[in-house]
Amino acid sequence: MKQAVIVDCIRTPMGRSKAGVFRNVRAETLSAELMKGLLLRNPQLDPNTIEDVIWGCVQQTLEQGFNIARNASLLAGIPKTAGAVTVNRLCGSSMEAIHQAARAIMTGMGDTFIIGGVEHMGHVPMNHGVDFHPGLANNVAKASGMMGLTAEMLGKLHGITREQQDAFAVRSHQRAHAATVEGRFAKEIYGIEGHDANGALIKVLHDEVIRPETSMESLAALRPVFDPANGTVTAGTSSALSDGASAMLVMEESKARALGLPIRARIRSMAVAGCDAAIMGYGPVPATQKALARAGITVNDLDVIELNEAFAAQSLPCVKDLGLLDVVEDKINLNGGAIALGHPLGCSGARISTTLINLMEHKDATLGLATMCIGLGQGIATVFERV
């Protein structure tokens, strides 16, 4: 079977969704700039050999509608001979894009793919136009469509305290701020034009949503937002609302080597799994277990892990049940996570994978895992290997 490898991976800075640096930049532009960036960074690649552009996006309406993958690829000047498709596995959409490209390569259905994802949550809100079938209430708990309440439920089931959640959130901001100051995001962030608070055009080079001043005291002052009477989940322990895109160049290994392109990581295994929609945040556990089994390794073999931080109350039960509580500081989300950086839905899968690969290089690690929960009860996971 042919091997799928990551040749390059980049992301935009994460902009605040409310009056942020990308308030005047469309989702297609964020996407197209990254596509162009991948080609500029890898001049050995002939764009005419691109088989397909696979782009994750959840809210496929307004500027994100009508196959944003194709719209963005045309804006980027990618040859019209390349295909383009937009995929939607909710929060796991751009990781699904990785998986689709990898499967195509492994089965001989192409050797060069641009993949990624985008979500401009400032322009297209998460709940825009949502209309669940009334009959779903016969099959799943009513709260299953309310992500914050699913986090409350998962946290309660696993005995996660408010203080544990607050500490996890503080760590996320501290780690992300340190990564910014120390330049550890420099290799993955691709500068994008945006606007400062006064409306002046600027090149955005850093994430806008990190709050380095976050403390246990400031978080303790926040009220529970999803269950005001009995809850523990606050805005401060939830993923921030942000706008952003991420992108990867995924190729068949021998083709990349023949062109003299770098092999930054090989896709070792992939998995998706379902779980109870009422505790959708638990999805990374069964997905990770499947991916590890397919890779023939155990969780102890992993050097670095990126677990998407939808909520602290969701992340901590997954860490606990995967047997990773003792290695959080050494292995998990070492540059912070979505609580600090935000979770632009369609962008996040490739974003955490990009951060993971850069961390693996920084630490000279061999095996890494990227995994995330998915609304309505799914998980997705990818094991990467440096070769």
Swiss-Prot record:
CC per GO annotation: cytoplasm
Enzymatic class: transferase
Main subcellular localisation: cytoplasm
Catalysed reactions, as listed in the record: an acyl-CoA + acetyl-CoA = a 3-oxoacyl-CoA + CoA
Matches recorded under Pfam families: Thiolase_C, Thiolase_N
Annotated pathway: Lipid metabolism; fatty acid beta-oxidation
GO MF term set: acetyl-CoA C-acyltransferase activity
Keyword field contains Lipid metabolism: yes
Keyword vocabulary terms for this entry: Acyltransferase, Cytoplasm, Fatty acid metabolism, Lipid degradation, Lipid metabolism, Transferase
Active site location: 91, 343, 373
A GO BP entry: fatty acid beta-oxidation
EC numbers: 2.3.1.16
Location in or out of the cell: Cytoplasm
UniProt family annotation: Belongs to the thiolase-like superfamily. Thiolase family.
Function recorded in the entry: Catalyzes the final step of fatty acid oxidation in which acetyl-CoA is released and the CoA ester of a fatty acid two carbons shorter is formed.
Assembly information from the UniProt record: Heterotetramer of two alpha chains (FadB) and two beta chains (FadA).
Name of the protein in question: 3-ketoacyl-CoA thiolase
Source species taxonomy: Bacteria, Pseudomonadati, Pseudomonadota, Gammaproteobacteria, Alteromonadales
